[in-house]
Design a protein with these regions (language model features):
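Long, positively charged amphipathic alpha-helical accessory segments at protein N-termini or as interdomain linkers
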Residues: 1-26, 32-33, 136-164, 174-319
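N-terminal lobe of the biotin/lipoate ligase/transferase fold
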Residues: 1-157, 178, 230
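Conserved active-site carboxylates
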Residues: 171
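Short, ordered beta-strand-loop transition motifs
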Residues: 47-49, 167, 289
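Short loop/edge segments at beta-strand edges and connector loops
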Residues: 79, 166-168
Length: 319
């Protein structure tokens, strides 16, 4: 069905005869494949007698060859998967050798931090998981998710989203709305040799939340901000290049060398916040982060430091 999708991705009308001739199948077979696209990927296809078929909106489909040409590690592009992070870990368990990159057009069980569901409609956003082998102990993991945030921030700015900023520990926001998130998952002993999946989700061309997905926080996308469809292959290429650059800096010099840069882009630097840790809510003012990426808060006149995990940060005056 991939060949049919590539013909339809321009959002223009195509007759059944034209589509069948291009793919080498009958018009009846085209009809069946169109029905399968609608049911499997929840795509809306308009059917107009005398004009043919078109997608409700154009798509920017990912192309494995274009992505692989700009990437220094193996790339797997899937049409649909439960979770790219889960798939990367399955491949590790099956004997795959990192580094490797898993990308999907759609996730059926995409997830974010703290078990939250990540809306993952077909062909609209980016679902990206990079599996790495990490040696050298905890130093190589310190601040890693924040470093990924810096790479993602540069990729967004390169795409024209200059207002994007960071929210500790793993979110990127524009105008108070979430545009991207990061989920790191470990396998093995972090004190010795382990593997880490850098999971990245970016709202690229999403215009409305997919049916059945109630997104529990304000969100935006590159398309909404820029007012036009974004080439997702170009964005993947940019993100991968930035990731390689920042990961090299982190490996050689640690997060401490990037701490000031991260703080300069932290949207809530100096703000009054509420930090939820289980049933406990801690109110304080953001001082920044330390050399390990932990959050520094001034709480009742004293500095306290908090690491990631199941912590949730919001502005103090948020309802």
């Amino acid at each position: 069905m991939q060949s049919l999708l590539r013909l339809l991705q321009d959002g223009q009308f195509h007759s059944g005869e034209e589509l069948g001739a291009a793919i080498g199948v009958s018009r009846a077979a085209i009809w069946k494949r169109l029905q399968a696209l609608e049911s499997e990927f929840d795509l809306q296809i308009h059917k107009v007698r005398g004009r043919g078929y078109r997608l409700e909106m154009p798509l920017s489909l990912l192309a494995a060859d274009l992505i692989a040409a700009s990437c220094s590690y193996p790339v797997t592009l899937l049409q649909q998967v439960d979770s790219t992070n889960a798939e990367a870990l399955r491949r590790l368990s099956s004997g795959a050798t990192p580094p490797l990159l898993v990308i999907a057009e759609q996730q059926t069980a995409g997830r974010g931090r703290r078990g939250r569901r990540w809306a993952s409609p077909f062909g609209e956003n980016l679902y990206y998981s990079l599996l790495l082998r990490v040696s050298g102990g905890m130093r190589q993991l310190e601040g890693l998710s924040l470093v990924v945030g810096l790479a993602l921030l540069d990729a967004l700015r390169e795409a024209g989203v200059n207002e994007a900023g960071l929210k500790w520990p793993n979110d990127l926001l524009v105008g108070g709305r979430k545009i991207a998130g990061i989920l790191l998952e470990l396998s093995g002993d972090p004190a010795d040799v382990c593997h880490v999946v850098l999971g990245i989700g970016v709202n690229i061309n999403m215009r409305v939340a997919p049916s059945g997905d109630a997104i529990d926080q304000p969100w935006t996308s590159l398309r909404q901000i820029l007012g036009e469809q974004v080439d997702r292959n170009q964005f993947v290429t940019s993100l991968t290049r930035q990731l390689e650059r920042y990961l090299d800096m982190h490996r050689l010099r640690g997060f401490a060398s990037l701490r000031e840069q991260w703080e300069e882009s932290h949207l809530w630097q100096g703000c009054l916040v509420s930090l939820a840790a289980g049933s406990q809510a801690i109110k304080g003012r953001v001082l920044g982060v330390d050399d390990t990426g932990a959050l520094r808060l001034e709480v009742e006149g004293r500095e306290q430091v908090f690491s990631g995990g199941e912590l949730s940060l919001r502005l103090h005056d948020d309802s």
